[in-house]
Amino acid sequence: EGNTIGEAIFDETTENTFVINEMNVPILCMGTKNIVVSASAEGILVSDIEQADRIKPYVDQIDQQIMYAEKSWGSYRVIDIEEESITIKVTLNPGHSMNYHSHEHRDEVWTILSGEGRTIVDGMEQSVRAGDVITMSAGCRHTIIAKTELQVMEVQLGKEINVHDKKVYELPATR
């Protein structure tokens, strides 16, 4: 017997097993009894039901970059982290945008996966849709504005990629 949020499969010997799965791959539980399984981009918890409420001191010891966040403008999920690159899938809600900003130590490449919107790169406005690729060099001011829900794969490239490398500007007047 299993209870689930997200995709999970339980065999006939499973008892009192609870699964919360935020990943896009299934979780298979076989012969499990009295456990909680929680899987997200932040990590995976497998715990006896009686111990699950003791998670906080252990989670506080984990030092890692946030891998998924929901914001007022949409959401993002970190797909991959390498020594000189980070790949992030960004979803912008219709009518929302990123700040008009620049980075001193990294280049960025946006690949539009779905939806429609517009970019402003160093004051130049351009319409974008699925399949378009926009490249920004370090120091370049840029933003993206969603007309419809917009999914963007953002690749950050550089030797010093960090969250503090961001300068925000006022958006220039556009059409």
Q: Which stretches of residues belong to each language-model region?
A:
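Double-stranded beta-helix
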Residues: 62-64, 69, 143, 147-175
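Left-handed beta-helix
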Residues: 1-111, 116-121, 125-134, 143, ...
